[in-house]
Regions:
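A "functional boundary" signal
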Residues: 2-11, 16-170
Length: 170
C-alpha cells in the first residue's frame, strides 16, 4: 500500500515537473525555417510562405512568432518594408508577454523597418530600445548587430563620435 502511494506521488511529481518545463513545439516547416534563417533566408522564407494559409488558426503566440520569422527573413533578403504596422503588432504582443528575447529581436527589426523607410531618428530610437533590452538578454550576436546598425546610422547622420562609441559596443 505504501509503495503504491509512493509511486502515485512520484508520478504526480513527474507530471507537474514536465508540465512546468514544457517546451514550445513548432510545426516542422517553422523549425526548418529557423534552422535555415542565417544561411539560406530565401529557403526559410519559402518554408514560412508555405505555412501562411494555416497560421490564422494557430494560437496567437505561435502566429506572432511566425510573423516575426517572416519579418526576419525578409530583412535578411533585403526586401524593403514600407509600413511599421506589422512590427508594431509583434512588439505589442511581446511587451504584453514580457518576453525580452523576442522583444529585443522585434525592436531590432523595428529599427530595420525605419532604416528601410529612411527614417533614421526613429530607427535609432528602436535600435537603442533593442540595445536596452539586450542588457537583460544574452544574445551577443544580436547585440553586435544592433550596435553595428547604430554605428552606421550615426555615421550617416555625421554623428561620428556616437558612431565610434556604437562601433566599440559592437
Amino acid at each position: 500500500m505504501k509503495s503504491g502511494r509512493i509511486h502515485i506521488l512520484l508520478l504526480s511529481l513527474l507530471l507537474c515537473i514536465s508540465c512546468r518545463y514544457e517546451q514550445q513545439s513548432y510545426p516542422p516547416l517553422m523549425e526548418r525555417a529557423v534552422q535555415l534563417m542565417e544561411t539560406h533566408p530565401d529557403s526559410a522564407l519559402a518554408c514560412l510562405d508555405s505555412l501562411s494559409i494555416s497560421t490564422t488558426e494557430w494560437p496567437e503566440e505561435l502566429h506572432i512568432y511566425y510573423l516575426l520569422l517572416t519579418v526576419k527573413a525578409k530583412d535578411k533578403l533585403y526586401i524593403p518594408v514600407t509600413s511599421d504596422t506589422l512590427i508594431n503588432r509583434i512588439i505589442s504582443f511581446y511587451e504584453d508577454k514580457q518576453d525580452d528575447p523576442h522583444l529585443m529581436e522585434a525592436y531590432y527589426y523595428k529599427g530595420s523597418t525605419y532604416r528601410d523607410m529612411k527614417d533614421a531618428p526613429r530607427a535609432v530610437d528602436a535600435f537603442l530600445r533593442a540595445a536596452e533590452i539586450g542588457k537583460r538578454c544574452s544574445n551577443d550576436t544580436l547585440n553586435g548587430r544592433i550596435y553595428g546598425q547604430l554605428a552606421s546610422l550615426f555615421a550617416f547622420q555625421r554623428l561620428y563620435h556616437e558612431s565610434m562609441e556604437a562601433t566599440q559596443q559592437a
